């Protein structure tokens, strides 16, 4: 037996999701282009949220999700994320099992979004420097 975040367990979650299509995923680029017609839900702790989050996200920690589900509109698409993906996966499953239809989980979580969006910003700055 190993921890929940062990790479073997994560690989198992990914494989099960692919085989059974349990959770729809979205990537970090999509997270940057969401509009007000969608809900971006951060299920990390308030402390993690304060340290950094995706613009426009609302924070409902996974431990509070069941008791605060009434704060989420059922007629909008909900894009869920956590730090690396596990809590987002679990939150997505909770929402789907509670009758929410359009739920997506961020592949790689906030950590990947943060790394990729910073890398993209640095590339744009470098490109502008080269052009000037």
Feature map (PLM): residue ranges:
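Rhodanese-like catalytic fold shared by cysteine-dependent sulfurtransferases
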Residues: 1-39, 46-79, 83-132
């Amino acid at each position: 037996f190993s921890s929940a975040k062990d790479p073997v367990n994560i690989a198992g979650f990914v494989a099960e999701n692919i085989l059974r299509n349990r959770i729809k995923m979205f990537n970090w680029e999509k997270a940057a282009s969401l509009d007000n017609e969608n809900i971006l839900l951060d299920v990390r702790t308030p402390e993690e949220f304060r340290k950094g989050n995706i613009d426009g996200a609302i924070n409902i920690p996974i431990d509070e999700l069941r008791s605060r589900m009434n704060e989420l509109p059922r007629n909008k698409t909900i894009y869920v994320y956590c730090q690396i993906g596990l809590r987002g996966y679990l939150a997505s499953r909770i929402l789907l099992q509670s009758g929410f239809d359009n739920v997506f989980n961020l592949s790689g979580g906030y950590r990947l979004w943060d790394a990729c969006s910073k890398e993209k910003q640095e590339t744009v700055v470098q490109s502008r420097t080269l052009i000037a």
